[in-house]
Amino acid sequence: MEVVQYIHRLNMTEAGLSGTKALFLRIQKDAIPSVVKFWGINALRLDTNYPIVFEDQASAKKYTMVLRKFSKNAKELRINSIVDYLRDKNIETGDEIIFTRISKISGKYEYYISMKKNLCTQFCYVKPKKLYVILHKEHTSLTSDNGKLVVTSNGKEISLSYEFVGKDTLRDAASKIVGDSTAKALSFNLYKVLLGNDSPNNNMSLKVSNGKYILIEEKRWEISEINN
């Protein structure tokens, strides 16, 4: 028996917190070679919807999801019809969705789905030119609406300018993520110093340890194989 897992960490859009109503999981083109191996089909040539039935490992409830190629040029895959699962599980930004495929001796596949809650102290997400951080009020020592914050990234301390974000959409997202209506969204203007590229596919988590802010980059997806 062969067990293969595809682990996908949710960003703002996928968790339904970015203002969009279309809930789906986007699989970036750089992940496609591994995803082809996981789904067991030639996804690069997928021209129609490919339905797959997943059984929730916690409740045994079955969910039918659809793998679909969204753009031939971008070679982007989407997992559609996942909204029921996301809502049933009260999914939040940073949570992990774990898709598991089990190969039977008969050659058939069985698919399962499960989730793992995000236990990060803070959560970051990226938009063009900005790095936004959702802050728990009890974990921030920032007393002014703008200033400097020393952040540790890859073992290096970097002083960054910050400001609190006043947009209603970001304030709403902050309150949903941490469950606190007084939560604030913080923005850094110099995220390139930390990330080094314009369109990172990974999630960022800002953790607090002994009063220090530590920025950790986490992969948005990964494939793992367990052969029995």
Model-derived regions, located:
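Acidic, low-complexity intrinsically disordered regions
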Residues: 1-228
